[in-house]
UniProtKB/Swiss-Prot annotation:
Coiled coil: none annotated. Also found in smaller quantities in dentin. GO terms for biological process: biomineral tissue development; bone development; cellular response to insulin stimulus; glucose homeostasis; negative regulation of bone development; osteoblast differentiation; regulation of cellular response to insulin stimulus; response to vitamin K. Keywords: Biomineralization, Calcium, Disulfide bond, Gamma-carboxyglutamic acid, Hormone, Metal-binding, Secreted. The lineage of its organism: Eukaryota, Metazoa, Chordata, Craniata, Vertebrata. Ca(2+) 2 binds at residues 15, 18. This is Osteocalcin. It is found in: Secreted.
Length: 45
C-alpha cells in the first residue's frame, strides 16, 4: 500500500512531518515514508 500513494496523500504526510523538526530532518535524509512511519507509525492510507 505504501508504494501507491498519490501526490495529495504524500503532501498531507509531509505537512504532518514538517511540524516535527526531528521528523523533518529524517524526511530530508531518508524520505517521507521512512520518516513518517518512524515517528507516527503506519501510513493510514
Amino acid at each position: 500500500a505504501a508504494g501507491e500513494l498519490t501526490l495529495t496523500q504524500l503532501e498531507s504526510l509531509r505537512e504532518v512531518c514538517e511540524a516535527n523538526l526531528a521528523c523533518e530532518d529524517m524526511m530530508d535524509a531518508q524520505g517521507i515514508i521512512a520518516a513518517y512511519t518512524a515517528y507516527y507509525g503506519p501510513i493510514p492510507y
